[in-house]
Amino acid sequence: MASPLLPGPPDQRRNLDWCWSKLPSDLMQFVFDRLGFADFQRAKSVCSSWLSVSRNSQPNNQIPWMIRFPKDNNHCLLFNPEEEDKMYKTPNLGNDFAKSSCIASYGSWLLMQPESEYMEEDLDHQCNNLYILDLLTRERINLPILQPEFGLTCPILWTDEKSKDHLVIGMAHEELAISFKKGDSSWKQIPTLSGIEECFSMVFKDHKLYCLSNYKLKVFDFSGDIPVKVFKTSVSKLLNNPLCISMRMRLPGIPMKDQLNHFKDDMVVTLAGHVLIVKCHRPSLSKIWSFEIYKMEGNNNKWEKTVSLGDETILLDLGITVLAKDMQGIKANSIYFSNPTPYFKDQYDENEIFIFDLDSNTVEQPHRSVSSSFPRSRARWFLPCFKRESYFLQ
């Protein structure tokens, strides 16, 4: 009996090639719709019939990508952890893209806000409007002019790929929550969100808005016409109120900004809908961030420290967790985060993107080629949503 590992006769090999190229298109589309981005690109190059089927399919991406924003550039760079040695470059995203910062994302959509130095220009000029941009198709939706001098804080972006509905929520100042959704002509106050003063972290998941302040965690249900508060609990004993705390005694000859202890608290909603409080800390004169995670246990409103996320991983920029089991290039029980305090740069903030391994309590950086490309450029993690018309990455 011939070994199945040995190549068959030429005619048999030709028949095998013919079988691969003549698979039913509905079966091939079923397969293509379940491939990640890297495998999708490889599969469509197998033969002309596979390429044809791929045009009616799109990758099913569950892997977080990194986006880098080179300073004063109208393009950005994308890194797929599945492909360690490759960076994708987007084409020109517009002149005002270089003058704006990404303040939130949902799928492949970015919420862009003008940099502070451009805020005081003519408000009628388009580059001073907030806008949302699909990074992969370049589809753009301009938002109404926002009057507050410092723009939108605690921003939230949500989109629906099928209906093209979109929702933007944020704080215009410490006591005023505003929103804009598809069909609106202007920003609207959300009076039912009163009582979220000093909110510094928001997450929108499954039509619920989670609001975290120094004192309270509140949850609002957005599934109806009017948001309804469905949960409230105290967090005042858990959080660090100040973002940065200076050393008690200043060291001579060292800039004051290098002597700051950096603190930041964030909120994360897990796949199961549990709320986590993530406490970040970087000591003065140090490059190393450390993290503590707290989870509310039961109905007793008590927060307990947790050291394991199981098969999940935190995407701190998005305030969510994703399933990381069997995901190539993604580590389970880790925190993927960008610099939590970008406005307090010092000589120890050499990098903008990190991975914290909860098993070893160590901070790692992505692949060397990513970390060395455009150092000190802004970066964040996001979950791209690939569409059939979005394959123009270089």
UniProtKB/Swiss-Prot annotation:
Domain F-box spans what residues?
17-63
Q: Which InterPro entries does the annotation name?
A: F-box-like_dom_sf, F-box_BR-signaling, F-box_dom, KIB1-4_b-propeller
* Recorded superkingdom: Eukaryota
SUPFAM superfamilies (UniProt xref): F-box domain
The cross-references to Pfam families, in alphabetical order and at most eight, read: Beta-prop_KIB1-4, F-box
Which positions make up the signal peptide?
none
Q: What is this protein called?
A: Putative F-box protein At5g66830
From which source organism is this entry?
A: Arabidopsis thaliana
